Swiss-Prot record:
This is Uncharacterized protein MJ0687. InterPro entries: DUF4367, LolA/LolB/LppX, Put_LolA-like, Sporulation_related.
Length: 335
């Protein structure tokens, strides 16, 4: 099972509720309408088909999917089962008969029930939205929209938006197509759909706990290391802080993820385990931060990444920012 694409698909499915409608509506009106419809929606079931084409390789993943507000979800196909009942998250590898378990506490609603009106407005302000007409997709009437990035006209997206519930049923973008088929809104999803009972002989590979909050001080309580909080964030505000503690093969690890910007423009990942980060002595990607701290930086593509280790904490800074901005952020974390 390809876990890279599995995690990608999970985030795409949970986080794809943004869209708009008619040509005459502005970003504020679209955001308000979408927020109203999302708040009225209590649950959803669908078959989700995700097709990726990366470097000429096409991969298709299909899942049974269910979501119930505020924080229950279910995904399943022939390879994997992922469920969360709002308190515990499980990922089960069917072929290997192995599973991981994560206890969840804190403001989980921030992850699965965010302020979509604010998110949608921000997205639409960065795209030019064209209304292409109406089409029927999978038996449901849809508005068809084309979104073209104001910064990069090559970045395009086409959406088929359900007329009744204002949710996207098909999203086409560069290299990825997401389709929701057999969609049912506001259905009664059985509680046992979100629960997991390990099959006979299933092996627990790792267990841990996850805490989420909009307050870094709250997640600080659940990790043993001092979180490196950036003093400079390129004007982006903290949206979510998440701490995880895991035990796999009798090895413990702790990770903190800080997300900044309404659209997640900046992510800072800090981790502590028994494996030090290896920084080469030289190379074109090697830079020196404040106080002689060595770091690696990758500035190819839209997403830039910077990695370094400080006080035993491995740090990855990633975002759609200029590399000089990433360096300023990193230096603001070093005392």
């Amino acid at each position: 099972m390809n876990y890279k694409y599995l995690i990608l698909s999970l985030f795409l499915i949970v986080g794809v509720f943004f869209a708009g409608c008619t040509q005459q509506m502005n970003a504020d009106e679209i955001a308000k309408k979408m927020q109203e419809k999302y708040e009225a929606m209590k649950s959803m079931e669908a078959d989700v088909l995700i097709t990726t084409n990366i470097m000429g390789q096409t991969e298709t993943m299909q899942y049974k999917y269910a979501f119930e507000k505020p924080n229950k979800f279910y995904m399943e196909n022939d390879d994997v089962l992922i469920v969360c009942d709002g308190k515990t998250y499980y990922m089960y590898d069917k072929k290997k008969n192995q599973y991981t378990k994560m206890e969840i506490k804190g403001e989980l609603n921030n992850m699965f029930n965010p302020d979509y009106g604010k998110f949608i407005k921000s997205m639409l302000e960065k795209f030019n939205v064209s209304y292409l007409g109406e089409k029927t997709y999978d038996g449901r009437k849809c508005y068809v929209l084309e979104l073209i990035s104001k910064e990069n006209p090559e970045e395009k997206m086409k959406m088929y938006v359900d007329e009744e519930y204002w949710q996207p049923l098909k999203i086409e973008m560069d290299g990825v197509t997401i389709e929701y088929k057999n969609v049912k809104f506001n259905v009664d999803v059985p509680d046992d759909r979100f629960k997991f009972v390990p099959p006979e002989g299933a092996k627990l590979m790792s267990s841990g706990a996850m805490t989420t909050s909009k307050n870094i001080d709250e997640v600080q309580k659940d990790v043993s290391f001092k979180i490196l909080v950036p003093k400079y964030t390129a004007g982006l505000e903290l949206q979510n802080a998440m701490a995880t503690k895991q035990n796999a093969n009798n090895e413990e690890s702790e990770t903190v993820i800080l997300t900044y910007g309404e659209n997640g423009e900046l992510a800072i990942i800090e981790s502590k385990d028994n494996k030090p980060l290896t920084i080469p002595e030289n190379g074109s990607n090697l830079i020196t931060l404040k106080n002689g701290v060595k770091a690696l930086i990758s500035d190819s593509g839209d997403v830039k990444m910077l990695m370094f280790e400080y006080n035993g904490i491995k740090v990855i800074i990633a975002g759609k920012l200029d590399k000089n901005e990433l360096i300023k952020i990193a230096n603001s974390m070093i005392e």
